[in-house]
């Protein structure tokens, strides 16, 4: 039996794994899902998030609660890749493999914010649509928020069932934009995050994080293996849940 820990993306929550969780459990595995700070039904506000550690706190608490011999398959989607990478840096001995599903994936050279800030710089005004950036924090420590409006969200859910898109519209929450002011300027370590096995799952019809940007992140920080779900949009847990579970089961078998 493997133990999967599933990390949701920005503005979403543990709810987005509702199709994948029972499939993995039906295959005989243990699955842990949770809400990141100020997401899903977590009662914190985005203003409570002053550091990347604050954002990742529920994930860090989950990993901390496991025994020293417990190893998990850490699966991160979209913006969840950055708090997941921090968790892997802090608890490398508890990670058998980290799986980045069309996800922001830091390196060990730049600050963890580097890939997200690079992404923001790569999208045009036309592509940005109603992807809204806001601000909070103080003059000394300015921070940014991000929110996925219904038009940008629709692009992310392009091949997903309409019901899942409607559900997402109802459940969206403001997320912290992962800037260097949030993460600090230090990179994740080669001894921690850099020492774990990583696999990247490319989603071939993703209009949220384009395929060329997914491929750039893989070039920027090479992984053990790259898999692809050709007909998946940005939300493979909705558009291609069976294919996603198939990849996750194969990965868990390969990286004990």
Swiss-Prot record:
The active site is at 78 (acyl-ester intermediate), 206 (charge relay system), 234 (charge relay system). Its EC number is 3.1.1.-. GO terms for biological process: defense response to fungus; innate immune response; jasmonic acid metabolic process; oxylipin biosynthetic process; salicylic acid metabolic process; systemic acquired resistance. Gene3D superfamilies: alpha/beta hydrolase. Pathway: Plant hormone biosynthesis; Lipid metabolism; oxylipin biosynthesis. Signal peptide: none annotated. It comes from the Eukaryota. SUPFAM superfamilies: alpha/beta-Hydrolases. Esterase activity is down-regulated by salicylic acid (SA). It holds the Pfam family Abhydrolase_6. Induction: By pathogen infection. It is an enzyme of class 3 (hydrolase). InterPro entries: AB_hydrolase_1, AB_hydrolase_fold, MES/HNL. It catalyses: methyl (indol-3-yl)acetate + H2O = (indol-3-yl)acetate + methanol + H(+); methyl (-)-jasmonate + H2O = jasmonate + methanol + H(+); methyl salicylate + H2O = salicylate + methanol + H(+). Keywords: Hydrolase, Immunity, Innate immunity, Plant defense. One of its GO terms (molecular function) is methyl indole-3-acetate esterase activity. Expression of MES9 can restore systemic acquired resistance in SAR-deficient tobacco plants. Methylesterase shown to have carboxylesterase activity, methyl indole-3-acetic acid (MeIAA) esterase activity, methyl salicylate (MeSA) esterase activity and methyl jasmonate (MeJA) esterase activity in vitro. Required to convert methyl salicylate (MeSA) to salicylic acid (SA) as part of the signal transduction pathways that activate systemic acquired resistance in systemic tissue. MeSA is believed to be an inactive form that needs to be demethylated to exert a biological effect. Belongs to the AB hydrolase superfamily. Methylesterase family. PANTHER family: METHYLESTERASE 9, METHYLESTERASE FAMILY MEMBER. This is Methylesterase 9.
